C-alpha cells in the first residue's frame, strides 16, 4: 500500500515546488501549460468546468449549478489570473505568491470531479461528484458539505486539511506529511489509508478498513468495521463501535514475515 502513497505524492510535490519557485522569482504561474487571463478577458461561454485548480492563497466558494458563473471580490483582484478549458477552471496570480491581498472567488459549476490546491488557498464546496478526488500540495484546505460517492480519493502532500460529510462506497486516503483529514461525518463501505508522516485521519465505516502507516500518523474509525493495519513507527489505527466504549488502538508493529 505504501508504494501507492509514493505514486500519489510525487506529482503533488512537483506541483507545490513549481508553484513556490514561480512565486519566488515573480514569474506568472501556468496551469495545464496555460497562463491565465484577467476576469474581464475570460470566456464565460460553453459548458461548465468539472475540475478546479487553485494555485494561489485565495479563497474559492463553489455553488452547485449547471450554468458556469464566476465573480471575484476582496483585495488584489486585479492580479488574479484565470485559466479555462473544456474541463478545468484554474485560479492563480499574475506575480505568483507576490500578488497583493486576498480575494474571494465565487464559482457556480456542477459538483467538481477534482479539486487541486497548490499552496495555501482554501476551497468551500456544497458537494462533490459521485467519482471525485481532492489533491493538496501544501497547506491548503477543503471544506465540503456533502458527497455521495462511488469512489472518493484524497491525496495530501504537506499540511493540508480536509473536512466533509457524506457517504462513499470506496474511500482512498494518501497522506505524505502532516495533513489532517476529518471525515468523521462520512461513512465508507470500504477504505484504504496510507500515511507517510504524522497525518491524522477520521471517518466512519461498517465495512473493511486497511491502513498502512509509516510514522506517527493516527487513523480513527467509528463503526463496526473490520480493521487491519501494517505500521512502522508509533502510528495507530483505532476502530470504535459508534455507541460503545473506546476500543484499544492497534499499535504500530513490524508486519509478520
Please tell me what each predicted stretch does.
Residues 117, 123-125, 134-136, 142-144, ...:
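Fold-core signature of tandem repeat domains
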Residues 2-10, 20-118, 122-135, 146-150, ...:
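Acidic (Asp/Glu) and glycine-rich low-complexity loops/linkers
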Amino acid at each position: 500500500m505504501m508504494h501507492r502513497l509514493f505514486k500519489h505524492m510525487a506529482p503533488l510535490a512537483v506541483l507545490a515546488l513549481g508553484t513556490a519557485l514561480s512565486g519566488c522569482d515573480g514569474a506568472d504561474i501556468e496551469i495545464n501549460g496555460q497562463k491565465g487571463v484577467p476576469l474581464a478577458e475570460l470566456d464565460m461561454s460553453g459548458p461548465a468546468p468539472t475540475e478546479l485548480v487553485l494555485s494561489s492563497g485565495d479563497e474559492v466558494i463553489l455553488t452547485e449549478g449547471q450554468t458556469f458563473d464566476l465573480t471575484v471580490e476582496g483585495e488584489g483582484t486585479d492580479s488574479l489570473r484565470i485559466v479555462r478549458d473544456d474541463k478545468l477552471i484554474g485560479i492563480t496570480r499574475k506575480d505568483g505568491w507576490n500578488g497583493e491581498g486576498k480575494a474571494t472567488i465565487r464559482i457556480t459549476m456542477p459538483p467538481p470531479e477534482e479539486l487541486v490546491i497548490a499552496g495555501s488557498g482554501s476551497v468551500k464546496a456544497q458537494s462533490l461528484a459521485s467519482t471525485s478526488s481532492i489533491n493538496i500540495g501544501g497547506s491548503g484546505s477543503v471544506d465540503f458539505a456533502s458527497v455521495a460517492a462511488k469512489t472518493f480519493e484524497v491525496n495530501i502532500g504537506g499540511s493540508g486539511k480536509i473536512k466533509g460529510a457524506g457517504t462513499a462506497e470506496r474511500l482512498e486516503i494518501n497522506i505524505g506529511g502532516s495533513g489532517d483529514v476529518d471525515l468523521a461525518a462520512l461513512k465508507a463501505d470500504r477504505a484504504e489509508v496510507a500515511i507517510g508522516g504524522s497525518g491524522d485521519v477520521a471517518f466512519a465505516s461498517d465495512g473493511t478498513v486497511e491502513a498502512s502507516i509509516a510514522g506517527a500518523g493516527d487513523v480513527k474509525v467509528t463503526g463496526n468495521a473490520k480493521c487491519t493495519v501494517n505500521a512502522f513507527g508509533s502510528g495507530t489505527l483505532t476502530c470504535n463501535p459508534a455507541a460503545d466504549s473506546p476500543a484499544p488502538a492497534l499499535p504500530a508493529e513490524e508486519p509478520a514475515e
